[in-house]
């Protein structure tokens, strides 16, 4: 196996931790913009009730909104919308994203200034790529005497519930479920971060080396990529078992949705490890066809779940859709874009992409498209919840 790294300038200037940081920062900005847009729409463009289109939605049980009281207790519904999107939340998101952007840009400029384009000394200054990570840790862990302290505390508690205990807050679980869903979009970035940890330990001398060369990458990188989906699966199962009478079936199906991603990740790792034993061309091995089948199944399941469950869009099976906020063609365009970007999720796990170092920025582009798709999903999901 060839260990030579092709020295593309863009690869070295935008090193791996900087690419991960860029994904996190863009996602934070888009999350804040999404919440801001939903807040404006809820305030200036209220939705007329449509009981016929919403009575069949099991998702309201998950959100702790009794269907019998949904249209009779307007005060409770208004209070729920107010708690769903608060100005303090997206203002804190803007502040958090701005601080991260400044720390990322500072580390990036210092990194380029120190290395001066010298490939030999490019990876000898790990503190600069990690500056945004240190900043994010401080913003989350250490309390600050600022106006957004409540949002900071809420984010910290949500992270602990989701990532350590695999739970969701029973009083308002939708935020914890959104956190776990967004975390799945960073599965590939989490695997890249493990590679960066190998670099810091001196096991890999270049960020652009393939992950299976050192650090048992054929096992730990797929495990790191699978962790967000494992978190989402356990969270759904825990909440479903705790609320068995109302939400067990829908949470079991949601856990199954996340579980469909695990075979794709596992088969990608196996094919990548055995790619020297067969050629991924016209004469594919049976593992490759299993990967194709699992990728199609996962993409189809998650796409249908996004449209019918998370967005509550019923066309073309219903004459009208539940939402009154936008015309039908807006939701149709959103579904089409979501389907196209769903395919890129599987494409970035394609085992053949790892055979060429020059595809590295292409894989990063796929990761950025997934962040954009998550913004689209979050917008229509919040639109469905607030309606």
From Swiss-Prot:
Name under which the protein is recorded: Protein ERD1 homolog 2
Keyword presence, Transmembrane helix: yes
Lineage: Eukaryota, Fungi, Dikarya, Ascomycota, Taphrinomycotina
Keywords: Membrane, Transmembrane, Transmembrane helix
GO biological process per UniProt: protein retention in ER lumen
Protein family according to the UniProt entry: Belongs to the ERD1 family.
Membrane topology (UniProt): Multi-pass membrane protein
The organism's place on the tree of life at top rank: Eukaryota
Pfam (any one): EXS
Transmembrane segments: 20-40, 92-112, 126-146, 177-197, 217-237, 252-272, 285-305, 326-346
Subcellular location: Membrane
InterPro entries attached to this UniProt entry: EXS_C
GO cellular component, one term: trans-Golgi network
Boundaries of every EXS domain copy: 212-387
């Amino acid at each position: 196996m060839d260990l030579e790294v092709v020295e593309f300038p863009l690869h070295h200037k935008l090193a791996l931790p900087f690419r991960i940081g860029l994904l996190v920062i863009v996602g934070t900005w888009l999350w804040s913009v999404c919440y801001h847009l939903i807040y404006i729409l809820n305030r200036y463009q209220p939705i007329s009730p449509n009981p016929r289109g919403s009575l069949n939605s099991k998702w309201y049980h998950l959100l702790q909104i009794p269907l019998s009281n949904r249209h009779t207790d307007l005060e409770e519904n208004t209070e729920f919308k107010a708690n769903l999107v608060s100005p303090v939340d997206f203002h804190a998101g803007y502040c958090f994203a701005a601080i991260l952007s400044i720390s990322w840009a500072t580390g990036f400029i210092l990194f380029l200034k120190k290395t001066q384009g010298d490939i030999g000394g490019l990876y000898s200054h790990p503190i600069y790529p990690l500056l945004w990570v240190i900043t994010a840790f401080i913003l989350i862990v250490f309390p600050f005497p600022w106006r957004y302290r409540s949002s900071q505390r809420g984010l910290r508690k949500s992270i602990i519930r989701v990532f350590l205990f695999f739970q969701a807050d029973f009083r308002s679980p939708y935020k914890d479920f959104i956190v776990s869903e967004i975390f799945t979009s960073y599965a590939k970035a989490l695997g890249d971060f493990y590679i960066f940890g190998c670099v810091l330990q001196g096991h890999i001398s270049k960020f652009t080396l393939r992950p299976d060369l050192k650090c048992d990458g054929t096992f730990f990188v797929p495990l790191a990529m699978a962790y967000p989906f494992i978190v989402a699966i356990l969270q759904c199962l825990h909440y479903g078992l705790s609320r068995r009478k109302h939400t067990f079936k829908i949470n079991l199906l949601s856990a199954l949705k996340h579980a469909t991603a695990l075979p794709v990740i596992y088969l990608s790792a196996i094919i990548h490890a055995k790619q020297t034993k067969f050629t991924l061309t016209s004469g594919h091995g049976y593992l490759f066809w299993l990967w194709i089948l699992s990728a199609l199944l996962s993409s189809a399941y998650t796409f249908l779940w996004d449209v019918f469950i998370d967005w509550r869009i019923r066309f073309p099976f219903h004459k009208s859709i539940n939402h009154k906020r936008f015309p039908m063609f807006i939701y149709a365009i959103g579904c089409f874009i979501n389907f196209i970007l769903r395919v890129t999720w599987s494409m970035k796990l394609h085992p053949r992409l790892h055979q060429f170092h020059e595809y590295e920025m292409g894989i990063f582009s796929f990761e950025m498209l997934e962040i954009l798709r998550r913004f689209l999903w979050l917008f229509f999901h919040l639109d469905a919840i607030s309606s």
